[in-house]
């Protein structure tokens, strides 16, 4: 069995795609396959990659199915023990696969790992790092890797996570697919974080390796939500409410049940 399957989802990617693929080929760990999924690109990026990398496995979709469905299609072709889901605007450190595989091999309770995320801006690999909160709040950390926890965490970056194959299969068995395709694009990784935690899988940030990420490259690298297209904004807001519907509502329901139990089981004071 191949050790790692790298699934890349492309839709009209720009020049950063070339650097992304070069970083893959420069990995110190070599036991991997690349599954290149194209979501109906019209800018010639698919043809360029096919010419430069004939050994990749290519999956060509006629339409842009969005991130969730596109990745699900790519995952269905993966044969590796571990599966890396890689955005096209990510540059991996040369030891990325090696360190992540080592972490997964050493701990069978890990369902997902990823390295430390750094910003990639204007063609430069920067050294500041940031983490994303579950509510969409980003905390910028300008002091190297300070604040990055070496251990279990609720979630890691959704731009370059590596999942255990058995984790993927267990999610598919429970829900019917790995990513919930209702999300299309945005918050599908947060959905998985809740789901993996519920199923008892651990997630870990591997601090001995890193990856650089442009962020939102498919929507013109616009960082602020309101700088992106109206359709993207609407989808993000919809997906936030969908997350709340799926998970957070249960917390409020349980809390209200708890309060009602306290109210009706407490002794009633007599006048």
Language-model regions, residue ranges each:
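Active-site donor/metal-binding and catalytic loop motifs
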Residues: 174, 181, 199-202, 206-227
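N-proximal low-complexity "stem/linker" segments adjacent to membrane-targeting elements
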Residues: 1-25
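Cell-envelope/extracellular polymer assembly enzymes that use nucleotide-activated donors
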Residues: 2-5, 33, 191
């Amino acid at each position: 069995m191949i050790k790692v399957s790298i699934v890349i989802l492309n839709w009209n990617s720009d020049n950063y795609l070339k650097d992304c693929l070069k970083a893959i080929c420069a990995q110190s760990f070599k036991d991997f396959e690349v599954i290149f999924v194209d979501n109906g690109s019209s800018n010639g990026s698919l043809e360029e990659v096919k010419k430069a990398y004939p050994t990749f496995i290519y999956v060509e979709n006629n339409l842009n199915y969005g991130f969730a469905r596109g990745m699900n299609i790519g995952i269905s072709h993966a044969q590796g023990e571990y599966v890396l889901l890689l955005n096209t605007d990510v540059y991996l450190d040369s030891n990325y696969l090696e360190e992540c595989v080592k972490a997964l091999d050493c701990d069978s309770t890990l369902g997902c790992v990823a390295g430390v995320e750094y910003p990639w801006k204007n063609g430069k690999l920067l050294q500041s790092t940031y983490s994303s909160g579950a509510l969409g709040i980003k905390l910028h950390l300008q002091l190297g890797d300070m604040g990055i926890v070496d251990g279990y965490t609720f979630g890691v970056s959704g731009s370059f996570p590596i999942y255990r194959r058995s984790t993927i299969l267990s999610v598919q068995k429970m829900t019917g697919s790995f990513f919930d395709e209702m999300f299309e694009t945005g918050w599908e990784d947060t959905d998985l974080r809740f789901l993996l935690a519920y199923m008892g899988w651990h997630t870990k940030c591997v601090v001995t390796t890193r990856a650089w990420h442009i962020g939102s490259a498919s929507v013109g690298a616009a960082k602020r939500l309101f700088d992106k297209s109206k359709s993207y904004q609407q989808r993000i807001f919809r997906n936030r409410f969908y997350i709340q519907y799926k998970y957070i509502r249960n917390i409020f329901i349980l809390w209200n049940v708890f309060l009602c139990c306290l109210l009706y089981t407490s002794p009633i004071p007599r006048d």
